[in-house]
Each structure stands twice: as C-alpha cells, then as structure tokens.
C-alpha cells in the first residue's frame, strides 16, 4: 500500500465520524467509467517485430468517488479512485515490451492479463481556496498535463492548492513527488526523456487572469529539481465578430534551462533524440501562435511553432526510468501543452519550425448534436541534425478523427471516437500509421 492510499484510509476513518455533516454526503459524486480501446501502431520501416507492429485491444474501468466538504470554516473531504485494466486481445507478436510500450503492461514477453491501481486524495476548503493531497492528482496546466490518451489516466502524487480569492484570477501552486503511468500499477519518481534517474520534487506556481470575458493572461513557473526550470507566458483572446462567428488568438511562450545535476550521468535530457548545444542539458525557448476562425459549426485553425536552435523542448516524462534491477519501469506516456502534441509525432526538436492547420466541424449545426469531425496537418522543417552540422531534417503528419456521443435514451453519454494518424519524416521517429478506436461510457451513481 503506497503512502497516499494509507493516508486516504486513515482519513476515511476520521471523516466517517463527520459524514452526516451537511455537504459531505449531499455534495458527493460517484461514477464508473468504461473505456474500450483498439490500438494499432504500424511502423512502416524495419522488420516485422512486436515493436514495429503493435495491435492490441483492452478494457479500462475507472471508479471515482468525490465527496463534498464538511461544514465549518474549514471543510474537509476525500476523493478515491480505482483503476482496472483488462487485456482482451493482441497476443504474441503484437505486444512490444519494455519502455517501447505504454498501452498495457507486460508480463514477460506478453501483455499482462490485467492490472489495477487504487489511489485517493484528502482535501480541504477555506473560503475560495482548495488544497488537495494524495496520489490521484491530475493537473491540467501549461507546465504539466496529466496524460489520458490511452486506456487509463496518468496520475500524480503530491499536493496542490487552487485559490480564487481575487475576482477573475485563479492561482495554482503545487509540489509533486511521484507519477503513476497510464499503463502501470506502481509509481515512480519524476524525470525527463532520456534520463534513468528521477527526482521527487517538482514545484510549480502561477496564475490565470481573466482580464475581460474575452481575454486571458497566464504566467507559470515550474522546477523539476536536478533537471530543469521553466517559465511560461500565455495569452488567449476571443473576438466575437457576430452571432456564431468569432476569431480566437492563442499565443504561448516557454523558456527552459538546466537545474542542479542535469547533464550528469543518469540526469541527461536526450533533447527528444535531437541536437543540443550542450548535450544532455536543458536549454530551450519555444513559442507558438494559433489563430482560429469559427463560423457556425465550422472552425478553421492555422498556426506556427518555433523551437530554438540550442535544444529540444522539455516536459515531465518518465518513459526511460529503470528499476533497481535495471529493468524498464514501463512508466511511459506523457503530454505537453502544444498543438503539436499530435497522434504520433511531437515536433519539438532543436531548430524545428512547424506550420500546422486544422479544419473541424460540429454537426450540431446540421441537427446532429454529438457528432464532430476534424482533420489536421503538421509540417516540421529546419530540424537540426543530431551532430549539428548535417543536413536539416523534416517531418510531417496528417491526423483525422471523428467523435459521436449519444444524446438521449438509455445509452445517453455513450461515446465513440475513431482516430487515425499518418507520420512520415527522416528523423529518429519511425514512419508510422496509427489507428485508435475508442468506446467511452460513464455512469453516475450520485
């Protein structure tokens, strides 16, 4: 039993005495979510091996309980989460092992039959400020996004504070110590791509300021001890042109630098398998600008992202961690705050200039609510060769998806998603065709 689960059990016993307090039970929510996913990753280069042709189907079940808060100046509550993954298909020959697989954990050279995880948080509320402490945290911030792009979600252990004491301003602070991968029953420390060592101290703080109803300004600072420091600035503005017509501007800037032991053996950042002015170290500035014109159900997006020449973009990534025996932890799977975090590629190597566009349509405008479709194209150029002197590299990707959620009847809320991505390039990322078919359903008890 990990520390957060033990703390949750103790807290449940304490709060059980107050469970009758107005708000604790009355405001509670409980739900069970089912996600069935077919995942097919077909590498278009190299021999036909499990690592080059992954094809698996699995079922994920997630139970969530969110209590309300007890009465009093300071209210207390608990959150609990249970995750179960069940492997359905994709036997020998279709399941890669080690850190190359982040869809389902391995048992020897095959997929495990099932895996599970239990975690939870304790929480407190004072006025318009909430604190959460535990192992079921799922931040969604510019400097950290919990990944939920496969069967079950990635979660973090630590503490967070969110405060809205000032009108139109939301402050977020936190310290995180461990992460549980999206295909893992255990937790690890925190790290970056390429590093075999980890850190138990990720500090962050920042604010979202709603200047007007149409303008949002953001600033965040993050520090992963012994790896990197990062500053983020963001601006989001929506200009309402007319009814059902608007123009959105989204500008983002990241400035990241080395911290502590970064660059030492075990603490080296692989710069996303690209060039680095100082190999193994973090040294990066990345900006992006996106513009979206919406007219009725149509949305046209165009944007550009620039990664500077000194090194790749950095973010929390536990994919290369190993256990005490030198075996892969299987903690891969990470997200970052960029449109270029695409189905297959990331487009964040040193020197890379990426131009991207997307067209999406909401069929509610045609009387079919719940049906949406989109197609996107990303083209990355000027990627610096790993040795810094060779010919610049390039990559491109086309992504398409269609989503439908049933709006009425016994199956209201049942959702289906079909995604397909085609990636080609001359970088270290293998050419790949990837398909995901996903069925989602959530049933609320309370």
Labelled PLM ranges:
Residues 3, 7-138, 360-364, 373-376, ...:
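Beta-barrel outer-membrane channel/assembly domains of diderm bacteria
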Residues 55-59, 114-118, 153-157, 199-203, ...:
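Residues that define the transmembrane beta-barrel architecture of outer-membrane proteins
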Residues 126, 138, 151-153, 179, ...:
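Solvent-exposed loop/turn segments connecting transmembrane beta-strands
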Residues 172-192, 244-340, 418-437:
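Outer-membrane beta-barrel translocator/channel fold
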Residues 302-389, 397-400:
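C-terminal structural cap/anchor segments
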